[in-house]
Curated annotation (Swiss-Prot):
This is Probable protein phosphatase 2C T23F11.1. The keyword Ribosomal protein does not apply. The keyword Hydrolase applies. GO terms for molecular function: metal ion binding; protein serine/threonine phosphatase activity; ubiquitin protein ligase binding.
Length: 356
C-alpha cells in the first residue's frame, strides 16, 4: 500500500452528461493517499465517429503523469487505427494501447517518468460493446440486476501472466512483479519493459489489453467502470446492487458515484489498507433511446440471476471471449498459492459461474 495521510481528502470531483442513449455520471476522490493518481474519460460521441461512445478509468501508480497522459490520448490512438475505420474494434483497441505505450516511451513529457497506469475502456457503437483492459481496474454491466463482468484482473499470480514475466527475465514474489508491482499489465512502467529479445506483448509488464465483446439488449441497464479502490471493497454484484437501488429511486448517476466512493472509504487505514486507495468510478446508464424514467423503472424490477452459460450450452459473445481467456490460463494454477488468502473472488480471471 502507498503512503497515506493522517486524514482522508474527501472532496470529490464529479461530472455528468447525457444524450438519447446514455445517462452518465462520474466521480473521483483522493481519499487517504498522499496524491491523486487516477484519471478517467467519458465521451458520449467521439469527434471522428459520432456514433461511437468511449468511457475509461485509469488507475495510476508511482505518479499521475502516465494516467493523465493516457486519459487525454488513448481514445485518439484507438480511433486513429485503420482497423477502427474497418470495423475491427478489437484490433483497434489492442493496437491503440500498444501505440500509446510506445509513444510515451519517446515523448519528452513521459519517457523518463517512472509511473504507470491501469486502463479499462468501454467503447460502444451501434449496440456493440468492446471492453479493453490492462491491469486490475474493472468494468461490469448490469443485466436485469445480474452483474456481468466485461473484464478480468491481470495479476502476476495468474499462471499465464507469471510465465510471461519469468520468460522475459522477471519473477513473481509475494504476488508482485519482481516483488514490487501488484499488477502484470499496465501502460507505462517502462522499467519492466526492457527485454530486447521480446516484443511489447511479451515484456515483463505489457500494455497489451484483453478485449471482451458484448451486444447490448434491452435488459442491459448500466455499466460501471472503476479502479480497484472500489473493487477491493465491494464485489461486482454488491456494486451493481448498490447502483441499481439508487437508480430505482431516480437518483442521478453523478450523486450515485459520489455515494459509492463514500461507501468504500475506510474509516481509518489500520486494517490492511482496504478503502484507503484513490477512488474513481464512471457510471453509464444505458437508455436505448428511451427516457431516463424507463431506466429507473427497469432498475426497480426484481433482479434475475441466470448464470453466465445457458443450460443448453449456447453462449453469447462475451461468454465465448471469457471462456477463451480462461482456456488460455490453463486452469489458472497459482504461483505462491500460500500468499493468496487476501485475494477476493472477484480478483479471479472470471467468476465461478463462468463454466467452461
Amino acid at each position: 500500500m502507498g503512503q497515506t495521510l493522517s486524514e482522508p481528502v474527501t472532496k470529490k470531483e464529479s461530472a455528468s452528461c447525457a444524450n438519447e442513449n446514455y445517462l452518465v455520471g462520474s466521480s473521483c476522490m483522493q481519499g487517504w493517499r498522499v496524491d491523486m493518481e487516477d484519471a478517467h474519460t467519458h465521451l458520449l460521441s467521439l469527434p471522428d465517429d459520432p456514433k461511437c461512445a468511449f468511457f475509461a478509468v485509469y488507475d495510476g501508480h508511482g505518479g499521475s503523469k502516465v494516467s493523465q497522459y493516457s486519459g487525454i490520448n488513448l481514445h485518439k490512438k484507438v480511433v486513429a487505427q485503420k482497423e477502427f475505420s474497418e470495423g475491427n474494434m478489437k484490433e483497434a483497441i489492442e493496437k491503440g494501447f500498444l501505440e500509446l505505450d510506445q509513444q510515451m516511451r519517446v515523448d519528452e513529457e513521459t519517457k523518463d517518468d517512472v509511473s504507470g497506469t491501469t486502463a479499462v475502456v468501454v467503447l460502444i457503437k451501434e449496440g456493440d460493446v468492446y471492453c479493453g483492459n490492462a491491469g486490475d481496474s474493472r468494468a461490469v454491466s448490469s443485466v436485469v440486476g445480474e452483474a456481468r463482468p466485461l473484464s478480468f484482473d491481470h495479476k502476476p499470480s495468474h499462471e499465464t501472466e507469471a510465465r510471461r514475466i519469468i520468460a522475459a527475465g522477471g519473477w513473481v514474489e509475494f504476488n508482485r512483479v519482481n516483488g514490487n508491482l501488484a499488477l502484470s499489465r499496465a501502460l507505462g512502467d517502462f522499467a519492466f519493459k526492457n527485454c530486447d529479445t521480446k516484443p511489447a506483448e511479451e515484456q515483463i509488464v505489457t500494455a497489451f489489453p484483453d478485449v471482451i465483446t458484448d451486444k447490448l439488449t434491452p435488459d442491459h441497464e448500466f455499466i460501471v467502470l472503476a479502479c480497484d479502490g472500489i473493487w477491493d471493497v465491494m464485489t461486482n454484484q454488491e456494486v451493481v446492487d448498490f447502483v441499481r437501488e439508487k437508480l430505482a429511486e431516480k437518483r442521478d448517476p453523478q450523486s450515485i458515484c459520489e455515494e459509492l466512493l463514500t461507501r468504500c472509504l475506510a474509516p481509518d487505514c489500520q486494517m490492511g489498507g482496504l478503502g484507503c486507495d484513490n477512488m474513481t468510478v464512471v457510471l453509464v446508464g444505458l437508455l436505448h433511446g428511451q427516457s431516463p424514467d424507463t431506466l429507473f423503472t427497469k432498475c426497480a424490477r426484481p433482479a434475475v440471476f441466470t448464470g453466465v452459460n445457458n443450460e443448453d450450452g449456447d453462449q453469447n459473445q462475451i461468454q465465448q471471449d471469457i471462456s477463451r481467456v480462461i482456456n488460455n490460463f490453463d486452469g489458472e494454477q497459482r504461483v505462491n498459492a500460500a500468499n493468496q488468502e487476501e485475494e477476493e473472488d472477484d480478483n479471479e480471471p472470471a467468476p465461478a459461474n463462468f463454466q467452461v
